[in-house]
Amino acid sequence: LSLIVDEKSPEALPNLDFKIMQGNSLLEQYKGVDLSTMTEKKIGAGESLTFFDSMLDVYRKNLRDKLTEYYACPEHDKKMQLRKDIADIVKQELVEQGIHIDFEDMDLSANSQFFLWHTWFHDVFSRPSKEGFDIVIGNPPYGAKISSIDKACFKHIFTSAQTIPNIQKGSLDTFSLFIDLGYQILHTKGNAIFIVPLSVTASDAMSGLHRLLINHCDEIYVSSYGDRPRRIFESAEQQVSIISFKKSSNKATRIMTTHINKRY
């Protein structure tokens, strides 16, 4: 806000109405159905069209058009109607593919089952040569109870959750999964920063996450904090680390850490 106050001619803040959402952001699938390709073109150049494929492309074009209108809409009421229209198109597309999921009582933009990253943020993931977010910031939950079904899904989605004999141990702690997710949704050269439990630095269960970041991030910075002389969060007796990294196609060229800031 101070930057805006100091500006001679401050520009209007972006409309965040359509960007504030909730959901199970670790999953972009539901009951085994992949929901990440709702906006992708089904037919490539030179491929033959079937009626089924052409109908899917119609739904996906309608969805992309509605999303473009949704992003540009300044009116709250109209935006809510567009959100409903988008949800209806998603449901129609699934039915067209023979996928019958009962979404009747489920809000596709706010539910505890999944989150449609590539639909609601189509503008972010469709940028040429820059597919993904510039910045990801998180204070993820940790120690959550995970069903056996979700565990199997996470092991398929996140490389850091996979245990590979003699190479790495995988972790299914939610904070580790969120760091992996943050890495996935960044574009190359994008930056992420998370505040998470201190165990991210030393637990052998984090070796899968360490391997992912070291092999695919240019720079990694870690600052660690104890709970004395003062807690980072007054209401939580938790030692934490702040980890930031820059996504890359190369191995890490710089890893910087602090000694744990702790005093008895």
Q: Where do the PLM segments sit?
A:
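Signature of N6-adenine DNA methyltransferases within the class I
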Residues: 1-52, 66, 115-264
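Coupling/switch/interface segments within P-loop NTPase motor domains and analogous charged loops
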Residues: 37-132
